[in-house]
Amino acid sequence: MKWLLLLGLLALSECIVHKVPLVRKKSLRKNLIEKGLLQDYLKTHTPNPATKYFPKETFATVSTESMENYLDAEYFGTISIGTPPQDFTVIFDTGSSNLWVPSTYCSSLACALHKRFNPEDSSTYQGTSETLSITYGTGSMTGILGYDTVKVGSIEDTNQIFGLSKTEPSLTFLFAPFDGILGLAYPSISSSDATPVFDNMWNEGLVSQDLFSVYLSSDDEKGSLVMFGGIDSSYYTGSLNWVPVSYEGYWQITMDSVSINGETIACADSCQAIVDTGTSLLTGPTSAISNIQSYIGASKNLLGENVISCSAIDSLPDIVFTINGIQYPLPASAYILKEDDDCTSGLEGMNVDTYTGELWILGDVFIRQYFTVFDRANNQLGLAAAV
């Protein structure tokens, strides 16, 4: 009897899913609008989501990664670093691979208004001579790399490499609702070859399965989760459909087509798509997105937002993404973002050099509709309709 109980406990331990709650907050864009600063920001920062995936230059020890993509980010979680633990609010970003937070080495105003990691207060911190630089448009966040214990939910990830900022551009981060970024993409795109957090978790045997899953609730504040080491079927309906990863860097897949009312409007001969929790909107080629915006009646306001009449939502068609032979419809209630009496399009155009071909970014607008499993063991994504 005792052996049966022990075996049952062992089986249960192997199925533990470590759930990390995410909170939905006002985005940096909304904060800048409220402060009357968005127009000034956009004069010197031209958001182009493509720069996140195709940085202009890469160095051996100093890497680049655009920060404008986080202008619309709304989902954030809490982690801790060091001994005793120091808490930070981060974006769990499947479109990048590094972990970085502000530090006491940073004297920028943006750092002063956010939580800063103090290595002198941590008995487990180990410094390095390696550097990190992340571009944001007209300037950059610079920092150094170090090692320490990182706690994510109930998981204690020891000897984790991460970035400590030394300078941060004020306007970009001053009103940001997050302290740093926790990247969940493949190690091949990690700056300075730093081991990503999830890879370290798996290497140390801290998760029972080499995968994690994401549920983004449509609720205004609570209910969203990142689940490490497992899948919870109570967050989706039907069965998971699996899609092979086409490039083991980002969570990139091949998409068959994009259609409206049965007519293909983009990606006619298949194209590439990246599933990215760090991108709030659904992004595609500028011409295709422009055509869709016109079709649904969206028009730009003075702040550069594509506004639309809220009364039109019920009459607008689904945008259908066909992936690996399966159709994933996105209703207007998903791609039109409603706040109070204002409605804006959740679609955004981006410019990509022609040699890369047609590329789409399936951001939070898509992930809210479809529970997503990021399966590293089999290099595949699982998609199912979210509850």
Curated annotation (Swiss-Prot):
Stretches assigned to the Peptidase A1 domain: 75-384
Residues with Phosphoserine modification: S129
Keyword Disulfide bond tagged: yes
Keywords for this protein: Aspartyl protease, Digestion, Disulfide bond, Hydrolase, Phosphoprotein, Protease, Secreted, Signal, Zymogen
Location of the active site: D93, D276
Record-level GO BP terms: digestion; proteolysis
Top enzyme category: hydrolase
InterPro entries from the UniProt entry: Aspartic_peptidase_A1 (IPR001461), Aspartic_peptidase_AS (IPR001969), Aspartic_peptidase_N (IPR012848), Pepsin_A (IPR034162), PEPTIDASE_A1 (IPR033121), Peptidase_aspartic_dom_sf (IPR021109)
Disulphide bridges, residue numbers: C106-C111, C267-C271, C310-C343
Catalytic activity, reaction form: Preferential cleavage: hydrophobic, preferably aromatic, residues in P1 and P1' positions. Cleaves 1-Phe-|-Val-2, 4-Gln-|-His-5, 13-Glu-|-Ala-14, 14-Ala-|-Leu-15, 15-Leu-|-Tyr-16, 16-Tyr-|-Leu-17, 23-Gly-|-Phe-24, 24-Phe-|-Phe-25 and 25-Phe-|-Tyr-26 bonds in the B chain of insulin
Signal sequence bounds: 1-15
GO molecular function: aspartic-type endopeptidase activity
Pfam families reported for this sequence: A1_Propeptide (PF07966), Asp (PF00026)
E.C. no: 3.4.23.1
Protein's cellular compartments: Secreted
Record's GO cellular component terms: extracellular region
Main location group: secreted
Family recorded in the similarity comment: Belongs to the peptidase A1 family.
Biological role: Shows particularly broad specificity; although bonds involving phenylalanine and leucine are preferred, many others are also cleaved to some extent.
The name this protein goes by in its record: Pepsin II-2/3
